[in-house]
Amino acid sequence: MATSKVVFITGATSGFGEAAAQVFADAGWSLVLSGRRFERLKTLQDKLASQVPVHIIELDVRDSDSVAAAVAALPADFADITTLINNAGLALSPQPAQKVDLDDWKTMIDTNVTGLVNVTHALLPTLINHGAGASIINIGSIAGQWPYPGSHVYGASKAFVKQFSYNLRCDLLGTGVRVTDLAPGIAETEFTLVRTKGDQAASDNLYRGTTPLSARDIAEQMFYIATLPDHMNINRVEVMPVRQAWQPFAIDRD
């Protein structure tokens, strides 16, 4: 039997998404978990199914038809989505823009922008129908607010997430649906290994000598946002570890 609250999490096979699944399950929410790696989804389902109902969807958010079909096919016990967490996203190629493969830029846009739009569009009718207490939590990044070398299209895609969240919030005024841009700083997840295309040494180097955020740190922020009183909306949350701050402006010197 489904609980009264259902969360739909994209990119649930690792990192923030996987941690969020655990946090929401611990609180008794039913889970709709999507991702491209089915075996990881199945493992997560097997882990959490003793706590709460779990529905998994092998899904590429870049494919709008597949997204629409998956939403239309949600079982009745999972159809009344309370919270959407648009977590699926990635960064590729931290090199300077002039050294990056164009396909990497396109992949980031297709996932971070188009994928987020596809899922949001498909679930808006459900969220609006739910009304008061429904939430959309879009996972942005400090890269969408603050420039740094190697951020190029990744930072621009997260700037889109921020502005889309603000604009969507305006459009949804009066529906009871909340919208939040959650922007993490440096966090130790699979994200960096993907960005370096499997270079474990380069990935490890980013975290060496410091204390980054954990995936659970961000998952707990998601849960806090999703469980606010119905009359409250947090527009944006920017979270950094204590040992991270803003970089100085870049200067070219002789």
From Swiss-Prot:
Active site at which residues? Y154
Which PROSITE patterns does the annotation name? ADH_SHORT
Q: What is its EC number?
A: 1.1.1.313
For this UniProt record, give its keywords in alphabetical order, as a comma-separated list.
NADP, Oxidoreductase
What InterPro entries does this protein map onto?
A: NAD(P)-bd_dom_sf, Sc_DH/Rdtase_CS, SDR_fam
* Pfam families named in the record: adh_short
Pathway(s) served: Organosulfur degradation
The family database entries (Gene3D superfamilies) matched by this protein are listed as:
NAD(P)-binding Rossmann-like Domain
What GO molecular functions are on record for this protein? Answer: oxidoreductase activity
Q: Which reaction does it catalyse?
A: 2-hydroxyethane-1-sulfonate + NADP(+) = sulfoacetaldehyde + NADPH + H(+)
Q: Does the keyword RNA-binding apply?
A: no
Positions binding substrate in this chain are S141
Q: Where does NADP(+) bind?
A: 8-32
Function of the protein: Catalyzes the formation of isethionate from 2-sulfoacetaldehyde in the deaminative pathway of taurine. The enzyme is specific for NADPH; NADH is not a substrate.
Oligomeric and partner information:
Homodimer and heterotetramer.
Family of the protein in this entry: Belongs to the short-chain dehydrogenases/reductases (SDR) family.
Name of the molecule in the record: Sulfoacetaldehyde reductase
Give the species: Klebsiella oxytoca
